[in-house]
């Protein structure tokens, strides 16, 4: 069990705000209208809450996927508003590495949790040409609370790992505190 307020920590919110800003810019630039969002490894799906609060009519629907049933229970509470209002948010208990995304049309795939996943099989199932947004960290701690399984040492390494056919955005943001800090890397582009 994890503290339910953990998804509100400074570094996680800062990273998600950065993602919102850059993803919205990419969607405008690519002239994508009313996309469905698929947030893989969504945890409490605070990202859906943030995206829909910023641009409530921008998206068709949002799907959040997480392997942890407790996280999905929290996600359903965080996104309760969109059970009754549009766009709808659907949260699913699902191992994203064992799901077929090939039928997802006009969809954008977001994964901010690749560092905590055993593999990147999810990426193989995303249809070619779809917009993908991937965010990770240079943290290396496999213990609580980070549970890092896949390390990334640089933005270049992330770009090479996923080899997008059209890289629209790549960047780094620093999360710095008095005694420690880390980097977040993000890429947005067409698979």
Predicted regions and their residues:
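Conserved class I S-adenosyl-L-methionine
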Residues: 32-45
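C-terminal substrate-binding/active-site "lid" region of AdoMet-derived donor-dependent transferases
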Residues: 118-184
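Conserved SAM-binding motif I beta-strand of class I
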Residues: 59-66
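A short SAM/SAH-binding and catalytic strip from SAM-dependent methyltransferases
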Residues: 102-120, 138
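Conserved SAM-binding loop of SAM-dependent methyltransferases across substrates and taxa
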Residues: 44-58
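Conserved acidic residues
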Residues: 35, 104-107, 130
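S-adenosyl-L-methionine
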Residues: 1-35, 67-108
């Amino acid at each position: 069990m994890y503290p339910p307020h953990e998804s509100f920590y400074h570094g996680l919110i800062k990273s998600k705000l950065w993602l919102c800003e850059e993803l919205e810019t990419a969607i405008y630039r690519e002239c994508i209208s009313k996309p469905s969002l698929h947030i893989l490894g969504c945890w409490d799906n605070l990202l859906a809450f943030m995206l829909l609060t910023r641009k409530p009519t921008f998206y068709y629907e949002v799907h959040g996927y997480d392997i942890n049933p407790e996280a999905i229970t929290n996600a359903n509470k965080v996104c309760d508003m969109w059970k009754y209002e549009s766009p709808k948010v659907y949260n699913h208990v699902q191992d994203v590495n064992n799901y077929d995304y090939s039928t997802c049309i006009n969809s954008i795939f977001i994964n901010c949790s690749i560092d905590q996943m055993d593999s990147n099989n999810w990426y193989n199932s995303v249809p070619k040409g779809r917009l993908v947004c991937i965010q990770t960290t240079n943290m290396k701690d496999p213990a609580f609370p980070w549970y890092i399984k896949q390390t990334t040492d640089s933005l270049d390494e992330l770009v090479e790992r996923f080899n997008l056919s059209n890289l629209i955005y790549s960047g780094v943001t620093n999360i710095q505190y008095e005694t420690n800090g880390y980097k977040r890397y993000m890429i947005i582009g067409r698979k």
